[in-house]
């Protein structure tokens, strides 16, 4: 399913730019899409981060991601309208095996996420980096490191200097933020828009026609669970 969906995204035109002319409707304007994958352990807040950027708010509730899900947002940069797709997968291996090869296809950037209140999620980062290497992502693909839940100051387990050292070792910028409280440290909006500006300057044209609501794949309804920022 993911393969068919992705093929259709890359092979079609955006429907938002059609205009009428003397001979009827002109071909719709082309728009570029950028696929950014968001990876990390379960419960680090990946879904909440993507929801914050695409919907502009913290979700009232969320469900455990099963398989792959993505959200999309159109933004304008230097007069050009582009689409940012944030792909989010389950952090649990049993939900990832059947989808992972599709998840890494045609990736433009990677966001590694850890929970600042959970040292184990930070220690898992090398395994996520290794997974990227195994799927042959080009070395020039932008990568950033995001520590989430910085608003929970009394529960912080991962100090900034430790995270910064790790980021420097892997040539990644570090951001510390909170999907729940956007006023804490690096704003989620600024993080993804900074990445979008960088991608716009370097990546080739890709054509797309995903639905405007942006949420394409969703798990079957399950009881609500806490997003934990």
From Swiss-Prot:
This is Ras-related protein Rab-33B. It comes from Pongo abelii (Sumatran orangutan). Disulfide bonds: none annotated. Regulated by guanine nucleotide exchange factors (GEFs) which promote the exchange of bound GDP for free GTP. Regulated by GTPase activating proteins (GAPs) such as SGSM2 which increase the GTP hydrolysis activity. Inhibited by GDP dissociation inhibitors (GDIs). A motif (Switch 1) lies at residues 56-68. CDD domains: Rab33B_Rab33A (cd04115). The gene is RAB33B. Prenylated. Keywords: Autophagy, Golgi apparatus, GTP-binding, Hydrolase, Lipoprotein, Magnesium, Membrane, Metal-binding, Methylation, Nucleotide-binding, Prenylation, Protein transport, Transport.
């Amino acid at each position: 399913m993911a393969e068919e969906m992705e093929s259709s995204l890359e092979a079609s035109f955006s429907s938002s730019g059609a205009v009428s002319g003397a001979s009827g409707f002109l071909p719709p304007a082309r728009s570029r899409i950028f696929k950014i994958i968001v990876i990390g352990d379960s419960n680090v807040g990946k879904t909440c981060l993507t929801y914050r950027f695409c919907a502009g708010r913290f979700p009232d509730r969320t469900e455990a991601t099963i398989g792959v899900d993505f959200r999309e947002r159109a933004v304008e940069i230097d007069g050009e309208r582009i689409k940012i797709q944030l792909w989010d997968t389950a952090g649990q291996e049993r939900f990832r095996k059947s989808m992972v090869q599709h998840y890494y296809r045609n990736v433009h950037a990677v966001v590694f996420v850890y929970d600042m209140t959970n040292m184990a999620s930070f220690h898992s980062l090398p395994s996520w980096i290794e997974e990227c290497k195994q799927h042959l992502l080009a070395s020039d693909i932008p990568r950033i490191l995001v520590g989430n839940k910085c608003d929970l100051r009394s529960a912080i387990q991962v100090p900034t200097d430790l995270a910064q050292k790790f980021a420097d070792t892997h040539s990644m910028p570090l951001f510390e933020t909170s999907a729940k409280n956007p006023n804490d440290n690096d704003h989620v909006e600024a993080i993804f828009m900074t990445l979008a500006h960088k991608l716009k300057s370097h990546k080739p044209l890709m054509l797309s026609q995903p639905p405007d609501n942006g949420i394409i794949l969703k798990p079957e309804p399950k009881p609500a669970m806490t997003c934990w920022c």
